[in-house]
């Protein structure tokens, strides 16, 4: 069995175990409301919990210019109706529209970008503090594996 299939089976099993405590679902944001839920979670984790000092356009929202170009993978708790985990994904075609990758604002990616093939940048990863038992990150990995 190929590695990707084994990983998918593993993460599906992890998701079933996670469901015994919480009703969790992995999905992509499909509305502005979903994006805001991801941005609120990022604010809670990065700014409130970790003390990051980032420019805020809105109170309680962690966002930047790349958000509207990206896909946002969410783990949603169906019982509490909130995002409890998220990834921000920027494909190569989205990066062209965004004027580059977020990582290019921090690092020189000249050599990386010269490598043939397609690239995907994954960032702004976070998990709600009450859900850090492995289930949410497993669901995020499963969703990312399916996306790839």
What are these language model-derived features?
Residues 1-8, 41-61, 120-141:
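Amphipathic repeat-derived elements
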Residues 7, 32-35, 52, 72, ...:
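A generic structural micro-environment signature
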Residues 5-11, 53-57, 70-72, 100-109, ...:
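Short amphipathic alpha-helical surface micro-motifs
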Residues 1-21:
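Short acidic N-proximal helix/loop "leader" segments that mark the beginning
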Residues 14-84, 88-91:
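Short amphipathic alpha-helix that is part of the acyltransferase structural core
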Residues 92-148:
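Acyl-donor binding region in acyl/amide transferases
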